[in-house]
Structures are given as structure tokens and as C-alpha cells.
Amino acid sequence: MDNPFSKFTNSRTIQADLSLLEENYIPDSFPHREKQINDMVTILSSIMRNSRPSNIIVYGKTGTGKTSTTKYVTRMLQEATSNVEVIYVNCEIYDSPYSILVYVANFAGGEKIPELGWPVDRIYREAVDRINGTGKFFVIVLDEMDRLIKKSGGDSLYVLLKLMTDVENVKVSMIGITNDTTLLENLDSRIKSRLNQESIVFPPYNATEIRDIIASRLEKVFGPGVVDDTAINLCAAIGAQEHGDARKAIDLMRIAIEIAIRENRLKVTEKEVYEARDKYEMNVMHEAINTLPIHSKIVLLSAIVTQEIEPNSVITGEIYENYRRICEDLGFTPLTPRRISDLLTELSDYGLIVVDERNMGKYGRTRGFSVVKEIETIKKYLMEDENLSMFKTSKMTKQARFDS
């Protein structure tokens, strides 16, 4: 029997190092980000003169190169001097004063501090002492800083800014990365007065710029002629339509190449890109639904039920009534109507439902909702949650066509 893997090592298949297209890959060049790199280097160069640099706030939408550029510049800084430590903090994971202080203190060295159990003031003193003991500059990078502030207000940021002034033997500065240009507007004066920041803006890429970025990556993946120019242009156009998202364009190209390899095709064309787009959108939807809190899933389920039972009455009140019934069937305590309205807005932000204003005559205006894409797929993904699987035995199932 022939080895079933041999077809993937055949010399006539596409050979490519797709790790160069992964999200965590940091390239050694950043087309169309020369100004942002120069601005960041100029600010951080104070470290080379033994001075503390200004704090930096990096603004830009998803896929505009904020994080990868920051990682590149800080890596270059560490190559230029051994007297600096860079702490990269993912604020999706570390989103409270306690968790950030523990992470920073443990990074600075010494016996590992437990993630729970210590008073915050003790951890704070430990972090200050440990950083002081290194004798080095510290640059703390807060990626997705908006999550930190929305979760804990300005408390976490205030603690870090206070830490910067309380260390005596070393100098600490911060780089905050966010896609929210209004993030700092509502912070109180005690934080704003300490922040002393300079801003660097990463504007959305246009299609031509994204094309250049993809082409520069592909040069390192394999030689010319493997990917049609039309395929590169299509990926770039799709990324440009998504508010200049180069990350999505690169992901599409990676998936298109994977499809070509699996199908034993010798070239990547528009056909593979269209297939990649469909697969990408399904993956994004699956991930979005899979990570929703349980009540958000029930609200989405309720919107589908309402739409399939009474398509002309998909309004907040009707959705809430079905939500309440489903909660009772599944053994969950319903949230308030106001909270459900907020969850509907969040589902709209995810692109899982569409919101429109409806005129109810003498009753005023209300919000209407619709689930307009891949309803059967959304049902399937929702039913993967064991907490919702009992819905298939609910009396509402047949009306909502979940019994197939």
C-alpha cells in the first residue's frame, strides 16, 4: 500500500512555509508603516540616552499592524541595548489590577507569586521591589488596552502609572495598543495627569498597500508564479473592504494556499481565494458563537425562534418573551429586559443579527431584528453547547424548525 501522505510530498505540489503567514509571525519589514516605526523609534530612543521615554498610545483598527509593528520595534530596541526589558501584556487575559501586577512582578524575577491569595498592596510592593532590583529600563506593552479599561475602569491603568513613579532605581514606560480612539476621553483627571502620552495612529490600509504587504510575504514563502496576481488582488480588495484589514487578507491567502495544497493544485487562483473566504467566514462565525456567554446564546436562539415563528414581529418584546420561555425550559434564570436589549446590541456588533428601526405608529418606534445569514449553520453551532441541547426536546422546537 502506498503511503497516504506521499501525495503531499510530491514535487509537483506547492511547497510553502505557511508559518510566514501566521498571525504571530513578525516580519523584518513593514511596507507603508515606515512613519509609524520612525515615530515609535524616536520616542523610545530616549532609553539610549538613559532617559525615560514618554508613554505611547497606539491607535488603529484591527489588521492595521499595531501589535506586530510594536513587537518589531521593541525587539529592535532590545537588540540595540541589553539594558531594557519589554513586558508584553495581553489585556484580554490580564484585565485587572491584581492579575497585571502578578504578571509584571513574576516577569521581573524572584519566587513565583500565586495568581490568587495575596493582598493587592503586597503584590504592588513586591512588583516595585523586583523591578527596582533589576537595574534595567522596563517597557510595559498593554495590547488591547481598551479591554482593560472597559473591564476595570481606570483602576488598572492608574496602578501601572503609579508604579512607574514609585520605582526609584529604574525607569518604566508604557505602550498602550487600542482600536478605540475615544478610549482616554472619559478617564478621570488623576490618570490623565500621570499619563503624559504621545499618540501614534495606524490608518487603515488601502487595497494597493495590502497588495504590497501580501506580495512581500509571498516572496519569502515561495518563488514567483505560484500565486496568480488576480488572487493577490482579490485578497487585497477583500481586506480593504474590511476597514483596511491586512490581517484578514493575509489569512485568506494562507487558507487559499492550504486549499490548493490539499487539492493537489499547482497554482493559487481567484477560485481558491473565494473558497478561502467562505471557509474563513464560517470559522469566524463558529468562533464567535462558540465563545458567547450562555445568555447571549439563548438570546440569539430566541431571535431565530421569533423570526421563524412570526417573521414580522422580530422586535425586542417578542424576542424577550421567547427568551424567557426558553430559559424556563432549560432551567436558567432570565435576565432583565434591559440586559437582553444590551445583549442584542452586542450580537449586532458581532454581525450575527441585523438591527433596524421600526415605526409602530401610535406606539412609537422600536428596534427590529433579523438573522439574515446562514441560519441553519447558526442553529447547528448553537446546538453544540450541551446547555442548549435540551432545547431540541422543547415544545417550541417544532415551531422553530429545530427538529430536523
From Swiss-Prot:
Q: Which residues bind ATP?
A: T64, G65, K66, T67, S68, Y205, R217
Among the GO biological process terms of this entry, one is: DNA replication
Q: Spell out the protein name for this chain.
A: ORC1-type DNA replication protein
Its source organism is Thermoplasma volcanium (strain ATCC 51530 / DSM 4299 / JCM 9571 / NBRC 15438 / GSS1)
Enumerate the PANTHER family for this protein. CELL DIVISION CONTROL PROTEIN 6-RELATED (PTHR10763), ORC1-TYPE DNA REPLICATION PROTEIN (PTHR10763:SF22)
Matching Pfam families: AAA_22, Cdc6_C, Cdc6_lid
Q: Does the keyword Nucleotide-binding apply?
A: yes
Record's keyword terms, sorted: ATP-binding, DNA replication, Nucleotide-binding
Gene Ontology MF terms in the entry: ATP binding; ATP hydrolysis activity
